[in-house]
């Protein structure tokens, strides 16, 4: 067997990297590919399109190089219990992980919203499905340790980004066969949520500098969020590069709808609407699929009970299943640098938001110097994963100190970033008193602002009215939605019938003629056709 033949079986093109691997491991590869297990029924659980070149059951994943495993088409480590997938704005970054966490189910998620901001400036151009495989591979090797350390009973892998590169089919083919949950939503409702998305304050510049995505006693939480929590008018390729909130081209105090923003979400590299694409690539790896709507996670007690029975995790009765998780999504966890020598913001004559740029920079410089000797607290929501850890492994292990903060708004909890500093922090009465005063004010100010922000949200009718006046954009939406909904259209058309706003949108498109799509869409369609997804178009 030649290395060219091995490459053909592996469904890959020979290059310097894999040629060396195939040559070095040629005897082992030949032995496996000629074995009865590979040639017979034992290979059914492996991908037909990207079969493994070594027996996965004989691989010690914990001592293996993920990049080498990728070349050899080895499935990801089988250390998780089920898969959750769906598109953006479907609650996969809010209600689903929060409610799963309450039931002792831990999630592993890789995507653009989970990366380290300090390393993310060039994320849009650097992230690939190969890198996703490597990152997830490493994370999956930690699941047993996480379960043992924090008391989680189950773990799921969340697939909420769909990166359309040359390796996308291979990435999904290398997942172990599992049951899965698809969370889906009326696409017009999803687009509405995308159009009033807020920026993340940790990517904003305050006083000319990025202050560790947090605040200190000299900066009130109200001032911080009033200045930095804005609505995005447009997106750029350097989305994760810190920006100034006063840039009116990028940000505003109210959500907006415009052509550029909608096109960005429709043609974003992570494919915001991708249920159909992911299912088409993933279906060979799925054993059973449970489908839930985003609306099922409103007053979600019965939803969580149903999911617990389907996936075999423990159902924990909780009043939090009736709460909205996303209200505090962009506010928490808030990092607070506590230092007893920092002046309190109400002792300063002028709030930071009204100060000059020079003064703001100077105050930030002083604050950052003092922060070096600070004890960092996190003001977080009751849906923080560490709440579960507190209940199962104790407050000392999780760093929770909420009990020392009387009167704070009930939707908040307080943690030490470093739990080992608990005794030192609580023994410093001056520091504790200042922190108590600060967090009492911050919790109520933040909750009040969060409720006020909800009143600014767009409605589905706003999106429909905008699309009714824009034929080209409407046609682009229709084309993207057709692919996105292809799985439901084939297997669960009754769900599409419940999408009231999408069906209204479809009526707007009845008399639309075929139009020439923008170049960006042609490129995306060509990419999908190359990996066999052209059949998803009507």
How does the language model describe each region?
Residues 22, 38, 46, 80-85, ...:
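Phenylalanine-focused residue identity feature
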Residues 27, 38-319, 329-358, 363-394, 401:
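PAPS-dependent sulfotransferase catalytic domain
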Residues 106-109, 131, 238, 242, ...:
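Intrinsic low-complexity, intrinsically disordered segments enriched in polar/basic residues
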Residues 113-151, 169-181, 201, 211, ...:
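C-terminal or late-domain output modules
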